[in-house]
């Protein structure tokens, strides 16, 4: 088994890190630079920054925040929110991002995935998929911070972006977001088993066993965490020690 990653996720709006439940009810979690430095010290493998209202509010990229973080933190940074063009990808990479995440814009224009991967390589293109379970038991793709239904099937969309050259999929269960009930393991496994590229599980971590389950039962290659880390319930180091004790290879 390859080394598995723990990736703290920093949802950003108005220059602050926030956390909500089911993508709403946001509460302040702190300054993005200070939180990023803390996670770097704790041994996080990567960090993900998502400007969760950039697309819906029509705002520009969070370049200044990424420049500040990249000057003080020395682990890979994935950045998303408001990415609309290949030029936006370049601007974020120049600001210090190692990977760029696209979500709503990829649904609106799937060629953006293909074009960005062709220009910059699949290794730095992440497609974020926000999934909500339907009454029929399937999962539908939602965009614009979970507010807009697309009618698209999550597994089929994952296959499409994989064919178009995405390097990773960041898969979030809207139903589980902030719930602390654990990942939607059926969703995570369905997507992970359908594509050959790495899948990052997101949405619902409430304890350290949930991280283990995301890997062993959800077949994810990495696990994203926000609530349990932002409010100091657990450190990244504690999470890695727990996962290692369960036989999961992690970078200590």
From Swiss-Prot:
Cellular component, GO, one term: cytoplasm
Main location: cytoplasm
Protein name, UniProt field: Imidazole glycerol phosphate synthase subunit HisF
Active site residues of this protein: 11, 130
EC number(s) given by UniProt: 4.3.2.10
Keyword Protein biosynthesis appears in the UniProt entry: no
Organism: Polynucleobacter necessarius subsp. necessarius (strain STIR1)
Signal peptide (from-to): none
Entry keyword annotation includes Ion transport: no
Gene: hisF
Subunit structure: Heterodimer of HisH and HisF.
Domain of life of the organism encoding this protein: Bacteria
Catalytic reaction annotation: 5-[(5-phospho-1-deoxy-D-ribulos-1-ylimino)methylamino]-1-(5-phospho-beta-D-ribosyl)imidazole-4-carboxamide + L-glutamine = D-erythro-1-(imidazol-4-yl)glycerol 3-phosphate + 5-amino-1-(5-phospho-beta-D-ribosyl)imidazole-4-carboxamide + L-glutamate + H(+)
């Amino acid at each position: 088994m390859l080394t598995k990653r723990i990736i703290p996720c920093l949802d950003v709006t108005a220059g602050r890190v926030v956390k909500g439940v089911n993508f709403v009810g946001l509460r302040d979690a702190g300054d993005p630079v200070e939180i990023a430095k803390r996670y770097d010290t704790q041994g996080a493998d990567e960090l993900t920054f998502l400007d969760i209202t950039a697309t819906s509010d029509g705002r520009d990229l969070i370049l200044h925040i990424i420049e500040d973080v990249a000057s003080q933190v020395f682990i890979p940074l994935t950045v998303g929110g408001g990415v609309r063009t290949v030029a936006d990808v370049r601007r974020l990479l120049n600001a210090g991002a190692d990977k760029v995440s696209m979500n709503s814009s990829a649904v609106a224009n799937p060629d953006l995935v293909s074009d960005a991967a062709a220009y910059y390589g699949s290794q730095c293109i992440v497609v974020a998929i926000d999934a909500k379970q339907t009454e029929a038991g399937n999962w539908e793709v939602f965009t614009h911070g979970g507010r807009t239904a697309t009618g698209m099937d999550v597994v089929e969309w994952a296959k499409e972006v994989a064919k178009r050259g995405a390097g990773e999929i960041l898969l979030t269960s809207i139903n589980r977001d902030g719930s602390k009930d654990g990942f939607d393991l059926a969703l995570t496994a369905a997507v992970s088993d359908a594509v050959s590229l790495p899948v990052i599980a997101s949405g619902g971590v409430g304890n350290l066993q949930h991280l283990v389950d995301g890997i062993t039962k959800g077949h994810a290659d990495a696990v994203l965490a926000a609530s349990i880390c932002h409010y100091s319930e657990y450190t990244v180091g504690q999470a890695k020690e727990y996962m290692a004790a369960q036989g999961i290879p992690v970078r200590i």
